């Protein structure tokens, strides 16, 4: 996983001052007894949760208890956050943008603490787990938007939303997210990130979140393109035929897709698709799940 860039970027979005180089030094020689400043405490917590997700994501289900547990771990070393870690907020809060000069700007107000937040989170988690018709990436973008709108915890909501994004991408088969930094892409487009949130929030309670979804998907598309460029530079991509590249791209965008669906999308014979899939399996670029008619494919 692109750990250093992800940890550094996600925390800087929220006002942390540590550079990637400083983050790298801290993670290389981390001593929890010496995490005396807020920035290093937040970096250490984010790193541990990101590492936990990478190692155990199949066992982390989207439940309120797991979300609270992730928040508890995120705030593990933050001295100022011990009083509220792992619990929904006790006081009203707002989505704020942080700037390099230390100033902050309110983007929008969020759900009131207490029942309004608890009920909203129960409904949001229930919707995500029961919704089966919406494409996983659209569903994820919608979940993150609503999570940020509720802002269920006293602090750390932005960082946690990006950790949950990584978790749900992995759980939905988008394993390539481990090799790029979603957080770094958002940091580079921070103004656009807040503008999309603000524009949609201005329409509450009947907002159209198309702008937010387009932004979210655009970030994913950009980092996927960056990954393909890395593959090209490493020589792996240049060893693939045009059809192999097309099929690999389809599998990246549609984890758990079946060979028949690929054949239909590319309008090429099913036997040809199966032969190419066998080559990609042999090269270790994809993996196969299921058996018989239930066989599907994801990138490794």
Give short role names for the model-derived ranges:
Residues 1-300:
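FIC/Doc superfamily catalytic core
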